[in-house]
A protein has these predicted regions:
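Metal-dependent phosphoesterase core characteristic of DEDDh/y 3'-5' exonuclease domains
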Residues: 2-7, 12-14, 27, 38-82, ...
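Short acidic, Gly/Ser-rich segments with clustered Asp/Glu that frequently serve as metal-coordination loops
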Residues: 19-27, 32
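Adenylate-forming
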Residues: 32-33, 75
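Catalytic-core regions of hydrolytic enzymes
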Residues: 86-105
Length: 205
């Protein structure tokens, strides 16, 4: 007897994510286990979509600082002060748990300059004794690296070639305008998602 249930195509899930953090690393090539190197995360934002770009979930958490204060330059850039983070923030562990739960259901992880954010979150997972390898093993796409030729912004390097485009530069190239709220992780990731699907339509990612 023929089954009355037709096979349904299960939609792939994509997770787009971005972080804001307390300063910059000394060494961008350091392992995620080099806890002295990678700055502390102060905001984590992510969007889960299906493969057509329909948003299934949007989340943004300010992280409550434990054992550090947010430096002034970062507070000015992100508008996240130590005081605000202590009032509005949630614990690092609860933010990471929720993010990793959503990540476990995703087929692909996307970010702009994704290796930086993978290292920031990976190091925080390591600090918390959580499974950072699960994050690093997930298939990922970097909209910065994949759009370098498309943006064709000349590099200042003596070797020539193109420089890696900032998210604002990619957004301007695709849509003719910049976006509001740069240096807020949620605004950045909303722009990254928009850019990713526009690049996908053009066959660039």
């Amino acid at each position: 007897m023929q089954s009355q249930y037709k096979h349904h195509h299960t939609m792939a899930k994509f997770i787009f994510f971005d972080t804001e953090c307390n300063g910059l690393p000394q060494n961008y090539r350091a392992s995620v286990t080099a806890t002295h190197n990678w700055p502390r995360m102060i905001q984590l934002a992510w969007i889960v979509t299906d493969e057509n770009g329909t948003i299934l979930k949007t989340q943004s958490h300010v992280i409550r600082p434990e054992g550090f204060t947010i430096i002034n330059e970062v507070a000015q850039l992100t508008r996240i002060t130590t005081d605000r983070a202590e009032r509005e923030g949630i614990t690092l562990q609860s933010a990471l748990r929720e993010f990793m739960d959503d990540l476990s259901e995703a087929n692909l992880i996307v970010g702009h300059n994704i290796s930086f954010d993978l290292n920031i979150v990976g190091c925080e997972l390591y600090r918390e004794g959580m499974a950072y390898n699960t994050l690093l093993a997930k298939r990922n796409v970097c909209t910065m690296q994949r759009s370098t030729d498309f943006c064709s912004i000349p590099s200042n390097s003596p070797y020539g070639g193109y420089k890696w485009p900032k998210l604002e530069e990619l957004h301007r190239k695709l849509f003719g305008c910049t976006f509001d709220g740069a240096h807020d992780a949620l605004a950045d990731i909303e722009a990254t998602k928009k850019c990713y699907f526009a690049l996908k339509q053009r066959g660039i990612v």
